Regions:
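Class I SAM-dependent methyltransferase SAM/SAH-binding core
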Residues: 1-26
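A short acidic, Gly/Pro-enriched loop at the edge of an enzyme's catalytic core
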Residues: 23-37
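Hydrophobic adenine-recognition pocket in adenosine-nucleotide-binding enzymes
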Residues: 42
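A short glycine-rich, Lys/Arg-flanked "PGG" loop and its adjoining helix->strand segment in the class I
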Residues: 51-67
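C-terminal alpha-helical "lid/dimerization" subdomain adjacent to the S-adenosyl-L-methionine
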Residues: 74-145
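Core SAM-dependent methyltransferase catalytic element
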Residues: 118-120, 137, 142-170
């Protein structure tokens, strides 16, 4: 879709499909060559068993000081509440009718995924992933469809994770 846009210019941007959970980096990109990784509703489609590899791959791609801009589903979102029992894969992880998967995150869970720190246990150890949380919040909204008289409670996680300048011991 991006490549078909008239504004797409290969001198300024490169768009490729990449399996972020594979061990191979995207075509044409070297380790430490990327300033920003944009992850919008990508992480939730991955199996929890793939998260560690994806975080590792993104760390490999980013320059020191580079950032991940993240937005995904939060726990308790309307989409989660609407899932029927037959769509449950594991806790907070579901399969849609079209076969795609979706996970619903909590703030502390994302901190642990991106930094390796367990917030619930007051973990003061340095990041084991090489990332720090720059900003992380929960975006809760009430959307109202007046025509259908529907109230829709939405919940998204939104954050910035920075690659630390110096490698952390571990």
């Amino acid at each position: 879709v991006i490549r078909e846009n008239e504004a797409y210019d290969t001198k300024n941007i490169q768009a490729d499909v990449w399996d972020a959970a594979s061990e191979v980096l995207p075509p044409g990109l070297e380790e430490g060559s990327v300033d920003v990784v944009l992850m919008i509703f990508i992480f939730s489609a991955l199996s929890p068993s793939q998260w560690k590899q994806v975080v590792h791959n993104i760390h490999r791609l980013l320059k020191p000081g580079g950032e991940v801009l993240f937005r995904d589903y939060g726990r308790g979102d309307l989409a989660q509440v609407r899932f029927k029992k037959g769509r449950y894969l594991e806790e907070n992880f579901y399969i849609r009718g079209d076969g795609t998967r979706v996970y619903f995150f909590e703030k502390n869970e994302l901190i642990k995924i991106w930094t390796g720190k367990d917030v619930e246990r007051s973990d003061d150890t340095p990041s084991s992933t090489g990332f720090e949380v720059v900003n992380l919040g929960v975006d809760r909204r009430l959307l109202v469809n007046r025509a259908k008289q529907l109230k829709m409670y939405r919940c998204w996680m939104q954050g910035r994770f920075g690659k630390q300048e110096k490698p952390q011991p571990g």
